[in-house]
Amino acid sequence: MAEFSPELRKDPISGRWVIISSARAQRPEAPEPRREDETPEARSRCPFCSGREDQTPPEIFTIRNNGELPNSPGWLTRVVPNKFPAFGIFPEINLRRIGMYQMATGYGAHEVAIESPDHDTYLEHQPLNQVARIVDTWWERHVDLERDRKLKYVLIFKNHGKAAGASLTHPHAQIIATTVIPDVLKSKLLNAKDHFVNGEGCIWCRQLDQIYYHENKIYNQDGTILVAIHQRDRVVADNEKFVAYIPFAARMPYEIHIVPKTHQCSFIQTSPEERLELAKMLKVVLMKVYKLLGNPPYNFYIHSAPNLNVMPRMGDYSTIREDFHWHIEILVRTTIWAGFEQGSGIYINPLNPTDAARYLAETEIDSEVVMSDA
């Protein structure tokens, strides 16, 4: 492999800077256990397992076998309020100030989406029809939460492994809806709008266009080609509706984005057919991650447009349906963000994104397993 000099790269969507420093790829890290430690006692008390429905608050949503009673065994996916919520439903939202400081009632929703009754089967190892049920469950809750016009933003996210923040090993995701738009999203929204109003269209659609149809060249001063960059080399997997790739300015070696090929600003705009293709893509990507890296901890989240029921088509959000493009980000925790990253907001990635994409793309998985409903 040719030597790769450290590079500063800027992500055009978030605006953040990343240092790609392949020479640091062998920096020692504390080893992660491949299987989370769990005592038999803790396992026997898991509140998410079938038969322990009385250990959680009453279910909000479920996909279950016909004829089964609510809050009883027989469910396939189950959503319950978080027992220790970050937000709650209150009669009114009380905004107030204390000097220079602002406060507001923590109005919102905090839910747990339990992926299956099976304590030990990760999402990527579930049958395809079960992964499709999981994706449909997220969609149903997202749609329902946006009916509350006080809620401006819905975030669906998953923590896998203790190092990624999971407190329980039973596979699950979480859903939080808030009255504020997070700053991370605001930055993306504003950059997307700037790109759009400058006549360059949707920035995600443009990225996909470059990945599939363009070769970028860097020239020497004498006009000869120094290097030709094929953006498609960062693709991990694709199917009819979605593409998964390592970003140009990835924060971690295995930061993976999954983006719909059709322009949609919100996850709730997806059709049943598109959600099935998303289930296939999630299965493929996470199976590759599992096989290549040995069940590493990871976080993933769906970045969707703010609640379209309440966002006015004016001001900063006047073009949101045209300029924003919903997507999934997966952060595989193979490195640690230490003092420099935390203090500067600049991330050091010890692996060239093209190499990371190649390693994942070349990781073979059984296509029959991906498509199997058994």
Where are these regions (language model features)?
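HIT superfamily nucleotide-processing domains
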Residues: M1-A374
